Amino acid sequence: MEEKEVVPTLKRPRKNLNLEAVVLVNGHGGNVPIKDYLIDIENELGLKIIFNNSIVEIEGPHAGTGELSMGMVLGIADESRLNEHCHFEKYPEVGMVGLQEARQQNKGIDDGACQVENEGVSVDLELGKTLLEKATRNIVKDVQSLLE
């Protein structure tokens, strides 16, 4: 999501609900750069914004074991397709394994890709539950900080 998309997305609820603050819960690593624009967005809207990146920070490699395990706990992943998931030629975005330019430009992406290449991807329901609980606790803390 880009800055130009965030402002209109928040403008109507800000006005209609008379919001003073929001917690934006990010679930996609590609949205992290929006943090660079939060002060401008806050000033434009007169709205306090907390950017919660817990899910992205704790899930591990993109489409890897952590993300897939959380998806299974939430009921949005299909375990029967797990074998197909690790065909990196067909799905280069899994773990970012096949995205060479991204791997060359970002050590964190390359580290995650190496992890997926070496360990593969699996479903671990306990891990998924633990990650979701941790993310939820962090989100609740952010909401509580707005209420203080």
Residue ranges and their predicted role:
Residues 1-21, 27-148:
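Extended, histidine- and acidic-residue-enriched regions that form the cofactor-binding/catalytic faces
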